[in-house]
Curated annotation (Swiss-Prot):
<keyword id="KW-0067">ATP-binding</keyword>
<dbReference type="GO" id="GO:0005524">
    <property type="term" value="F:ATP binding"/>
</dbReference>
<protein>
    <recommendedName>
        <fullName>Ribose-phosphate pyrophosphokinase</fullName>
        <ecNumber>2.7.6.1</ecNumber>
    </recommendedName>
</protein>
<comment type="subunit">
    <text>Homohexamer.</text>
</comment>
<feature type="binding site">
    <location>
        <begin position="58"/>
        <end position="60"/>
    </location>
    <ligand>
        <name>ATP</name>
    </ligand>
</feature>
<dbReference type="InterPro" id="IPR005946">
    <property type="entry name" value="Rib-P_diPkinase"/>
</dbReference>
<keyword id="KW-0460">Magnesium</keyword>
<keyword id="KW-0479">Metal-binding</keyword>
<keyword id="KW-0418">Kinase</keyword>
<dbReference type="GO" id="GO:0009156">
    <property type="term" value="P:ribonucleoside monophosphate biosynthetic process"/>
</dbReference>
<dbReference type="Pfam" id="PF14572">
    <property type="entry name" value="Pribosyl_synth"/>
</dbReference>
<comment type="similarity">
    <text>Belongs to the ribose-phosphate pyrophosphokinase family. Class I subfamily.</text>
</comment>
<feature type="binding site">
    <location>
        <position position="240"/>
    </location>
    <ligand>
        <name>D-ribose 5-phosphate</name>
    </ligand>
</feature>
<dbReference type="GO" id="GO:0000287">
    <property type="term" value="F:magnesium ion binding"/>
</dbReference>
<comment type="function">
    <text>Involved in the biosynthesis of the central metabolite phospho-alpha-D-ribosyl-1-pyrophosphate (PRPP) via the transfer of pyrophosphoryl group from ATP to 1-hydroxyl of ribose-5-phosphate (Rib-5-P).</text>
</comment>
<dbReference type="Pfam" id="PF13793">
    <property type="entry name" value="Pribosyltran_N"/>
</dbReference>
<dbReference type="InterPro" id="IPR029099">
    <property type="entry name" value="Pribosyltran_N"/>
</dbReference>
Amino acid sequence: MSAVSRIATLTRQSMLSALSDNNRLRLFSGSSNPSLSQEVARYLGMDIGPMLRKRFADGELYIQIQESIRGGDVYLIQPCCHPVNDNLMELLIMIDACRRASARQITAVLPYYGYARADRKTAGRESISAKLVANLITGAGAQRVLAMDLHSAQIQGYFDIPCDHMYGSPVIIDYLKSKQLTDLVVVSPDVGGVARARAFAKKLNDAPLAIIDKRRQSHNVAEVLNLIGDVDGKTAVLVDDMIDTAGTLSEGSRLLRAQGARQVYACATHAVFSEPAINRLSGGLFEEVIVTNTIPVPDDHHFPQLTILSVANLIGEAIWRIHEESSVSSMFR
């Protein structure tokens, strides 16, 4: 049985057809990941709503919703990935346009939440940008947020509106199970990711857990110090929420191999892939790098070990459940 329970397709499509006629449930896509939005729309059996998007000569963005959404339940899909500032501003303008068009309910769907790592002060006179982004989204007029794999769970509490939290792990776990790997050990790349790795291991038939003790010297620079757990002769699965420069994972893979790991897989929901991630990931340290399509991966960032899985059905199911006032959290139990 799939990780996502699904309402019968024909029933759903017939219901959505009637709903769409009344402009009740409407789906719109920003420009950051249109292919994901189209997949979500196909799952729901509906079309992406028409929207005019253009830039003025000075770089300012113009958005116009090109159909009536008065009284509608509107969902705006826009991961705030690179270029994060442009994509965030586009989302805010989309929300504002829908609010001024008298949408009954506006849900910001954020497959990737930009600025999530700035979730607390680690030094004096710093901004907590993750909270600022939450304030901006709320202030623009969103009444609900649907986010996937937030860097830290407490970001949900930064919102004064409902925030539904999804996880990309079900599609990754289903894929790993299909490979029938043996002698698995799930590895957290740092102490902060232990809860995520433990939940991941539980879904993989209670696989054993190992932890890499890491101390970060500066932003995007990590030093691996020690391994807690046994990986000798085993297939190690490194689990994280995102891959940025891949420094943590590549150093982790070296440590795991030095400790006797037979194979090393890297799994993450968000493929940020900042330089020099591609060189690190494609250099032979990993049997496979498994990510999802919350962030679009350009063709020139593909490499032989890369596998990209779709989370569109998860997002589509969550949207449907919110619209029907059903449980979202039960999808991930």
